[in-house]
């Protein structure tokens, strides 16, 4: 796919839950939760140094090819995914977030902020008043 991109000067929009493969096809990765971008950045930054708790959960869910680790417990995002028709107000991930901050996450929608060069996150953990 990279060869096709270069040869024909085209772009791909690769939509997946498999963040492990996304890093190989992408110049940038945008992680979305219930229709909102919650993290955006270069593939290595997003996959090796994720910022948002949901991105961290996606990466932790990637199966490890080492057979010795096949029985390793993987963290699971708590709770049930919300109804996409009736999304939670403010931070959409707050009902399931292990880092939930009452009075912040449930009261204010986090802005997408640049935390590192070209690496953005929408999370109160990285807000100006965090």
Name each model feature, range by range:
Residues 1-72:
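P-loop NTP-binding/switch modules centered on Walker-like glycine-rich loops
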Residues 43-130:
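Charged, flexible cofactor/metal-binding loops and thiol motifs
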């Amino acid at each position: 796919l990279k060869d096709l991109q270069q040869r024909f000067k085209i772009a791909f929009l690769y939509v997946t839950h498999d963040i492990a493969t996304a890093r190989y096809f992408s110049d940038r990765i945008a992680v979305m939760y219930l229709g909102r971008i919650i993290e955006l950045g270069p593939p290595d930054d997003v996959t090796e140094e994720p910022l948002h708790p949901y991105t961290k959960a996606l990466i932790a869910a990637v199966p490890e090819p080492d057979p010795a680790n096949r029985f390793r417990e993987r963290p699971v995002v708590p709770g049930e995914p919300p109804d996409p028709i009736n999304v939670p107000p403010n931070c959409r991930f707050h009902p399931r977030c292990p880092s939930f901050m009452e009075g912040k996450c449930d009261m204010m929608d986090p802005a997408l902020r640049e935390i590192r060069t070209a690496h953005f996150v929408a999370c109160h953990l990285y807000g100006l008043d965090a």
